[in-house]
C-alpha cells in the first residue's frame, strides 16, 4: 500500500506566556497585532517594556498595557474616559493604531518603532510626507 501523505501543515508549538500574561491577554494582543498588520513579537516587546503585560498599569499620566496617554488615544479616535484605557482591548485598539504609525516609519526595525512610539513621531511623519499613512491626519 502507498504511504499516507498528510496535507495538513505541521502546527508550530505555542510560545510560552510571558510573566503576567494570560492566555486571554495573548489572544487579545495577537488579534490587535494582526488587525493593524504589526509583528506580534514587536507588540509583545512593547507590552513587556511598558507594563510587563499588566493591563491595569498606571504610571503618572500613562494608562494600561501599552502606557498610552489619553490625549494620544484621543488623537487615534478614542472617546472614553482615561480609566477606559485600563481595559486591555481598548488600550490595544488605540495604542496599536499609534504603534502602526511608528512601525511604518521604522523601516522594519523593532527598536526604531518602539523609539518612535515612545517619543512621538509627528515631525518625522510630516518630514516624510506620511501624516495620512500614519494616521496622524485624515485622508
Feature annotation, model-predicted:
Residues 1-8, 19-24, 79, 83-86, ...:
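Non-catalytic cell-wall polysaccharide-engagement segments
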Residues 12-48:
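Export/targeting segments at the very N-terminus of extracytoplasmic proteins
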Residues 24-31, 41-42, 67-71, 90-101, ...:
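Extracytoplasmic/secreted proteins, especially bacterial periplasmic and envelope-associated proteins
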Residues 38-54, 95-96, 117-118:
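Short, functionally critical alpha-helical segments immediately adjacent to catalytic or ligand/cofactor-binding
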Residues 51-54, 72-75, 120-123:
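Solvent-exposed loop/turn segments at secondary-structure junctions
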Residues 57-59:
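A short gly/proline-enriched turn/hairpin at secondary-structure junctions
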Residues 61-78:
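Substrate-binding/active-site groove segments that recognize
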Residues 61-64, 84-88:
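A glycine-rich, coil/turn loop motif that links secondary-structure elements
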Amino acid at each position: 500500500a502507498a504511504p499516507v501523505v498528510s496535507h495538513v501543515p505541521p502546527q508550530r508549538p505555542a510560545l510560552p506566556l510571558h510573566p503576567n500574561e494570560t492566555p486571554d491577554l495573548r489572544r487579545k494582543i495577537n488579534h490587535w497585532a494582526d488587525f493593524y498588520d504589526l509583528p506580534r513579537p514587536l507588540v509583545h516587546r512593547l507590552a513587556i517594556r511598558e507594563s510587563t503585560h499588566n493591563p491595569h498599569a498606571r504610571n503618572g499620566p500613562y494608562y494600561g498595557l501599552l502606557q498610552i496617554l489619553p490625549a494620544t488615544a484621543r488623537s487615534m479616535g478614542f472617546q472614553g474616559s482615561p480609566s477606559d484605557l485600563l481595559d486591555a482591548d481598548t488600550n490595544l485598539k488605540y495604542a496599536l493604531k499609534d504603534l502602526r504609525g511608528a512601525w511604518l516609519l521604522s523601516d522594519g526595525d523593532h527598536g526604531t518603532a518602539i523609539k518612535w512610539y515612545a517619543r512621538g513621531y509627528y515631525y518625522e511623519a510630516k518630514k516624510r510626507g506620511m501624516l495620512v499613512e500614519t494616521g496622524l491626519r485624515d485622508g
